[in-house]
Amino acid sequence: MASLAESKTRAALSPDSTPDPKIPKRVPSKFIACDAWGGAEAIVKKALSHYNFPLKTLTNDNLTGVKEADIVLLSCKPQGAQGILGAEGIQAALAGKVLVSILAGVTVAQLERYLYPKNMSSGLPENACRIVRVMPNTASFVRESMSVIEISTPPLTDDQHALVSFIFSSIGRVVSLPAANMDVSTALCGSGPAFFALMLEAAADGAVAMGLPRAEAQLMAAQTMRGTTGLVLNGEHPAVLKDKVSTPGGCTIGGLMVLEEAAVRGAIARTIREATVVASQLGQGATNVNGTRH
Protein backbone atom coordinates (compact mmCIF):
# COMPACT_ATOMS: atom_id res chain seq x y z
CA MET A 1 0.00 0.00 0.00
CA ALA A 2 2.93 2.32 0.47
CA SER A 3 3.69 2.07 -3.23
CA LEU A 4 0.16 3.15 -4.06
CA ALA A 5 0.52 6.20 -1.86
CA GLU A 6 3.84 7.05 -3.49
CA SER A 7 2.44 6.72 -6.99
CA LYS A 8 -0.55 8.91 -6.21
CA THR A 9 1.72 11.58 -4.77
CA ARG A 10 3.94 11.34 -7.83
CA ALA A 11 0.98 11.75 -10.19
CA ALA A 12 -0.53 14.61 -8.21
CA LEU A 13 2.77 16.44 -8.51
CA SER A 14 2.96 15.93 -12.26
CA PRO A 15 2.08 18.80 -14.60
CA ASP A 16 0.92 16.22 -17.15
CA SER A 17 -1.94 14.99 -14.98
CA THR A 18 -5.46 15.14 -16.36
CA PRO A 19 -7.64 16.15 -13.40
CA ASP A 20 -11.38 16.39 -13.12
CA PRO A 21 -12.66 19.53 -14.91
CA LYS A 22 -13.96 20.93 -11.62
CA ILE A 23 -10.88 22.42 -9.97
CA PRO A 24 -11.10 22.83 -6.17
CA LYS A 25 -10.50 26.20 -4.56
CA ARG A 26 -7.26 24.87 -3.08
CA VAL A 27 -5.04 22.22 -4.65
CA PRO A 28 -2.17 20.33 -2.98
CA SER A 29 1.03 22.37 -3.02
CA LYS A 30 3.11 20.66 -0.32
CA PHE A 31 3.50 16.95 0.38
CA ILE A 32 4.39 15.18 3.62
CA ALA A 33 5.22 11.46 3.59
CA CYS A 34 5.04 9.54 6.89
CA ASP A 35 6.36 6.01 7.23
CA ALA A 36 7.35 3.63 10.02
CA TRP A 37 10.29 2.25 8.04
CA GLY A 38 13.44 4.33 8.01
CA GLY A 39 14.42 3.22 4.51
CA ALA A 40 11.25 4.66 3.02
CA GLU A 41 12.56 8.23 3.18
CA ALA A 42 15.25 7.63 0.57
CA ILE A 43 12.82 5.80 -1.71
CA VAL A 44 10.21 8.57 -1.56
CA LYS A 45 12.77 11.32 -2.13
CA LYS A 46 14.25 9.49 -5.11
CA ALA A 47 10.84 8.92 -6.66
CA LEU A 48 9.63 12.50 -6.22
CA SER A 49 12.80 14.60 -6.25
CA HIS A 50 12.44 15.81 -9.84
CA TYR A 51 9.08 17.47 -9.14
CA ASN A 52 9.32 21.13 -8.21
CA PHE A 53 7.10 20.96 -5.11
CA PRO A 54 8.00 21.03 -1.41
CA LEU A 55 8.36 17.51 -0.01
CA LYS A 56 8.85 16.55 3.63
CA THR A 57 9.46 13.03 4.89
CA LEU A 58 8.90 11.82 8.46
CA THR A 59 9.78 8.48 10.05
CA ASN A 60 7.70 7.21 12.99
CA ASP A 61 6.14 10.64 13.40
CA ASN A 62 2.61 10.53 12.01
CA LEU A 63 1.41 13.16 14.48
CA THR A 64 3.60 15.94 13.09
CA GLY A 65 2.57 15.10 9.54
CA VAL A 66 -1.13 15.10 10.39
CA LYS A 67 -0.87 18.39 12.28
CA GLU A 68 0.74 20.12 9.30
CA ALA A 69 -1.58 18.65 6.65
CA ASP A 70 -4.99 19.83 5.45
CA ILE A 71 -5.89 16.51 3.81
CA VAL A 72 -4.49 13.17 4.99
CA LEU A 73 -4.09 9.98 2.95
CA LEU A 74 -4.22 6.78 5.04
CA SER A 75 -2.43 4.03 3.10
CA CYS A 76 -1.23 1.50 5.67
CA LYS A 77 -2.11 -2.19 5.88
CA PRO A 78 -5.77 -2.62 6.98
CA GLN A 79 -4.71 -4.22 10.26
CA GLY A 80 -2.56 -1.19 11.09
CA ALA A 81 -5.33 1.40 10.93
CA GLN A 82 -6.51 1.10 14.53
CA GLY A 83 -3.03 1.62 15.94
CA ILE A 84 -2.38 4.65 13.75
CA LEU A 85 -5.72 6.39 14.32
CA GLY A 86 -5.82 5.51 18.01
CA ALA A 87 -2.39 6.98 18.71
CA GLU A 88 -2.21 9.88 21.16
CA GLY A 89 -2.92 13.26 19.58
CA ILE A 90 -4.13 12.00 16.20
CA GLN A 91 -7.81 12.65 16.92
CA ALA A 92 -7.14 16.30 17.78
CA ALA A 93 -4.73 16.73 14.86
CA LEU A 94 -7.39 15.51 12.41
CA ALA A 95 -10.14 17.80 13.72
CA GLY A 96 -11.96 19.52 10.87
CA LYS A 97 -9.78 17.90 8.19
CA VAL A 98 -10.38 15.35 5.44
CA LEU A 99 -9.01 11.82 5.93
CA VAL A 100 -8.87 9.74 2.74
CA SER A 101 -8.56 5.99 3.30
CA ILE A 102 -7.45 3.55 0.59
CA LEU A 103 -7.54 0.54 2.93
CA ALA A 104 -9.10 -2.55 1.37
CA GLY A 105 -12.22 -3.76 3.16
CA VAL A 106 -12.12 -1.20 5.98
CA THR A 107 -15.34 0.80 6.21
CA VAL A 108 -15.77 4.42 7.18
CA ALA A 109 -17.69 3.28 10.28
CA GLN A 110 -14.72 1.16 11.38
CA LEU A 111 -12.32 4.06 10.95
CA GLU A 112 -14.65 6.30 12.96
CA ARG A 113 -14.65 3.74 15.79
CA TYR A 114 -10.85 3.64 15.76
CA LEU A 115 -10.60 7.43 15.81
CA TYR A 116 -13.49 8.25 18.17
CA PRO A 117 -13.91 5.19 20.45
CA LYS A 118 -15.42 7.26 23.27
CA ASN A 119 -17.98 9.03 21.09
CA MET A 120 -19.71 6.19 19.26
CA SER A 121 -22.67 5.99 21.65
CA SER A 122 -23.29 9.74 21.68
CA GLY A 123 -22.32 10.56 18.10
CA LEU A 124 -19.26 12.12 16.51
CA PRO A 125 -17.91 15.43 17.84
CA GLU A 126 -18.78 18.60 15.93
CA ASN A 127 -15.21 19.04 14.72
CA ALA A 128 -14.82 15.41 13.62
CA CYS A 129 -12.78 14.91 10.47
CA ARG A 130 -14.54 13.81 7.28
CA ILE A 131 -13.47 10.30 6.32
CA VAL A 132 -13.60 9.41 2.64
CA ARG A 133 -13.03 5.88 1.39
CA VAL A 134 -11.37 5.48 -2.02
CA MET A 135 -10.24 2.35 -3.87
CA PRO A 136 -7.50 3.04 -6.46
CA ASN A 137 -5.15 0.49 -8.01
CA THR A 138 -1.51 -0.04 -8.87
CA ALA A 139 -1.93 1.38 -12.39
CA SER A 140 -1.73 4.77 -10.68
CA PHE A 141 2.02 4.46 -11.38
CA VAL A 142 1.25 5.22 -15.04
CA ARG A 143 -1.81 7.40 -14.33
CA GLU A 144 -4.20 4.69 -15.55
CA SER A 145 -5.84 3.86 -12.23
CA MET A 146 -9.53 3.13 -11.85
CA SER A 147 -10.42 4.81 -8.55
CA VAL A 148 -13.78 4.38 -6.83
CA ILE A 149 -14.81 7.10 -4.36
CA GLU A 150 -17.40 6.07 -1.80
CA ILE A 151 -20.41 8.37 -1.71
CA SER A 152 -20.32 9.85 1.79
CA THR A 153 -23.25 10.19 4.20
CA PRO A 154 -23.80 13.03 4.82
CA PRO A 155 -22.38 14.24 1.49
CA LEU A 156 -19.04 16.01 1.32
CA THR A 157 -19.09 19.73 0.70
CA ASP A 158 -18.68 20.72 -2.94
CA ASP A 159 -15.09 21.79 -2.33
CA GLN A 160 -14.20 18.62 -0.40
CA HIS A 161 -15.62 16.46 -3.18
CA ALA A 162 -13.83 18.52 -5.82
CA LEU A 163 -10.53 18.15 -3.96
CA VAL A 164 -10.78 14.36 -3.57
CA SER A 165 -11.89 13.97 -7.19
CA PHE A 166 -9.06 16.24 -8.35
CA ILE A 167 -6.44 14.16 -6.54
CA PHE A 168 -7.62 10.81 -7.88
CA SER A 169 -8.44 12.09 -11.36
CA SER A 170 -4.76 12.95 -11.53
CA ILE A 171 -3.93 9.24 -11.61
CA GLY A 172 -6.65 7.92 -13.92
CA ARG A 173 -10.42 7.61 -14.07
CA VAL A 174 -12.81 8.14 -11.15
CA VAL A 175 -16.33 6.96 -10.36
CA SER A 176 -18.41 7.50 -7.21
CA LEU A 177 -20.46 4.60 -5.80
CA PRO A 178 -22.37 3.80 -2.58
CA ALA A 179 -20.65 2.14 0.37
CA ALA A 180 -22.34 -1.18 -0.43
CA ASN A 181 -20.32 -1.38 -3.66
CA MET A 182 -16.86 -0.80 -2.18
CA ASP A 183 -15.85 -4.42 -1.51
CA VAL A 184 -16.67 -5.51 -5.05
CA SER A 185 -14.89 -2.38 -6.30
CA THR A 186 -11.85 -3.53 -4.32
CA ALA A 187 -12.05 -6.93 -6.02
CA LEU A 188 -12.59 -5.60 -9.54
CA CYS A 189 -10.36 -2.52 -9.49
CA GLY A 190 -7.89 -3.10 -6.66
CA SER A 191 -7.21 -6.79 -7.34
CA GLY A 192 -8.11 -6.61 -11.03
CA PRO A 193 -4.62 -5.77 -12.34
CA ALA A 194 -3.32 -9.07 -10.94
CA PHE A 195 -6.15 -11.03 -12.56
CA PHE A 196 -5.69 -9.34 -15.93
CA ALA A 197 -1.91 -9.75 -15.67
CA LEU A 198 -2.35 -13.50 -15.25
CA MET A 199 -4.59 -13.63 -18.35
CA LEU A 200 -2.07 -11.59 -20.30
CA GLU A 201 0.80 -13.82 -19.18
CA ALA A 202 -1.15 -16.95 -20.14
CA ALA A 203 -1.79 -15.57 -23.64
CA ALA A 204 1.90 -14.75 -24.03
CA ASP A 205 2.84 -18.24 -22.78
CA GLY A 206 0.66 -19.81 -25.44
CA ALA A 207 2.30 -17.69 -28.12
CA VAL A 208 5.77 -18.62 -26.85
CA ALA A 209 4.78 -22.29 -26.96
CA MET A 210 3.93 -21.78 -30.63
CA GLY A 211 7.25 -20.16 -31.44
CA LEU A 212 7.10 -16.44 -30.65
CA PRO A 213 10.02 -14.89 -28.76
CA ARG A 214 9.09 -14.06 -25.14
CA ALA A 215 9.63 -10.29 -25.38
CA GLU A 216 7.57 -9.93 -28.55
CA ALA A 217 4.83 -12.22 -27.24
CA GLN A 218 4.46 -10.16 -24.07
CA LEU A 219 4.42 -6.88 -25.99
CA MET A 220 1.86 -8.19 -28.48
CA ALA A 221 -0.39 -9.58 -25.74
CA ALA A 222 -0.21 -6.35 -23.73
CA GLN A 223 -0.94 -4.12 -26.72
CA THR A 224 -3.78 -6.37 -27.85
CA MET A 225 -5.35 -6.17 -24.38
CA ARG A 226 -4.79 -2.42 -24.31
CA GLY A 227 -6.39 -1.96 -27.73
CA THR A 228 -9.36 -4.08 -26.74
CA THR A 229 -9.97 -2.04 -23.59
CA GLY A 230 -9.65 1.11 -25.68
CA LEU A 231 -12.47 -0.06 -27.94
CA VAL A 232 -14.67 -0.88 -24.93
CA LEU A 233 -13.94 2.49 -23.29
CA ASN A 234 -14.88 4.08 -26.61
CA GLY A 235 -18.36 2.55 -26.35
CA GLU A 236 -18.03 -0.90 -27.93
CA HIS A 237 -19.87 -3.65 -26.03
CA PRO A 238 -17.57 -6.61 -25.26
CA ALA A 239 -20.04 -9.13 -26.69
CA VAL A 240 -20.42 -7.16 -29.92
CA LEU A 241 -16.65 -6.77 -30.19
CA LYS A 242 -16.20 -10.52 -29.72
CA ASP A 243 -18.74 -11.33 -32.42
CA LYS A 244 -17.19 -8.88 -34.88
CA VAL A 245 -13.91 -10.78 -34.74
CA SER A 246 -15.48 -14.26 -34.84
CA THR A 247 -15.88 -15.16 -38.52
CA PRO A 248 -17.66 -18.49 -39.23
CA GLY A 249 -15.26 -21.41 -39.11
CA GLY A 250 -12.35 -19.14 -38.20
CA CYS A 251 -9.53 -19.34 -35.67
CA THR A 252 -11.16 -16.83 -33.29
CA ILE A 253 -14.36 -18.82 -32.74
CA GLY A 254 -12.25 -21.95 -32.42
CA GLY A 255 -10.24 -20.37 -29.62
CA LEU A 256 -13.37 -19.01 -27.96
CA MET A 257 -14.86 -22.50 -27.87
CA VAL A 258 -11.84 -23.70 -25.88
CA LEU A 259 -12.40 -20.88 -23.36
CA GLU A 260 -16.11 -21.72 -23.06
CA GLU A 261 -15.45 -25.46 -22.72
CA ALA A 262 -13.03 -24.68 -19.89
CA ALA A 263 -15.65 -22.48 -18.18
CA VAL A 264 -13.25 -19.54 -18.21
CA ARG A 265 -16.12 -17.03 -18.20
CA GLY A 266 -17.56 -18.53 -15.01
CA ALA A 267 -14.13 -18.85 -13.39
CA ILE A 268 -13.35 -15.18 -13.99
CA ALA A 269 -16.74 -14.11 -12.62
CA ARG A 270 -16.23 -16.35 -9.58
CA THR A 271 -12.79 -14.81 -9.09
CA ILE A 272 -14.38 -11.39 -8.60
CA ARG A 273 -17.02 -12.83 -6.28
CA GLU A 274 -14.40 -14.62 -4.16
CA ALA A 275 -12.15 -11.57 -3.95
CA THR A 276 -15.16 -9.49 -2.88
CA VAL A 277 -15.87 -11.83 0.03
CA VAL A 278 -12.20 -11.88 1.03
CA ALA A 279 -12.02 -8.07 0.94
CA SER A 280 -15.02 -7.89 3.26
CA GLN A 281 -13.52 -10.42 5.68
CA LEU A 282 -10.12 -8.70 5.75
CA GLY A 283 -11.79 -5.42 6.61
CA GLN A 284 -13.36 -7.10 9.64
CA GLY A 285 -9.97 -8.27 10.86
CA ALA A 286 -10.36 -11.92 9.86
CA THR A 287 -7.27 -13.99 9.05
CA ASN A 288 -6.65 -17.01 6.81
CA VAL A 289 -9.87 -16.22 4.95
CA ASN A 290 -8.57 -17.70 1.69
CA GLY A 291 -8.63 -21.16 3.26
CA THR A 292 -12.29 -21.18 4.30
CA ARG A 293 -14.06 -21.76 0.98
CA HIS A 294 -13.77 -24.33 -1.81
Predicted regions: what is each one?
Residues 1-29, 48-56, 63, 89-93, ...:
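Eukaryotic N-terminal low-complexity, Ser/Thr- and Lys/Arg-rich leader segments
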Residues 110-130, 146-184, 196-234, 278:
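Internal alpha-helical scaffold of NAD(P)-dependent oxidoreductase catalytic cores
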Residues 219-294:
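NAD(P)-dependent Rossmann-like dehydrogenase/reductase catalytic/cofactor-binding core
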